[in-house]
Amino acid sequence: LHVSFKKPSEEICTFFNIDPEKGTKCMVLERVRGNKEYPFVSFISYFNPNIPLTGDEDFTQPLYGVLENKYNIIVKTSKEEVSARLAGEFIAEKLDIKSSDPILIRKRFVYDINQVPIEYNIGYYRADSFTYTIEAER
């Protein structure tokens, strides 16, 4: 678990509707899920800079519970994109795989009950541990 404050990319600035020229920083939460022998996903979450996060929150607790209990932010909607690519050195090191191994990338765009963007989350999944299931009804 690693918490920092970083200037977001232009794509993330657009999502949060912030001016990239102002140098606004977002709180960034990075964590790897799985265990030491088999890490299967690396998450990087950027949070709306209008949320007064300090980085001292207890992120061992459920994230959306922290947002609701401490900041009265109720998460309602998420939209997702899934794509594939090779891991590259940075992600390969986190997931204990080769840089040439395939990974799946899931971008999740999270909104509160008022459709205010709350979290921009990127998940990098080992391709050998990810199944994406969709159910549709007419």
Regions found by a protein language model. Name each.
Residues L1-R138:
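All-alpha effector-binding/dimerization core of bacterial HTH-type transcriptional repressors
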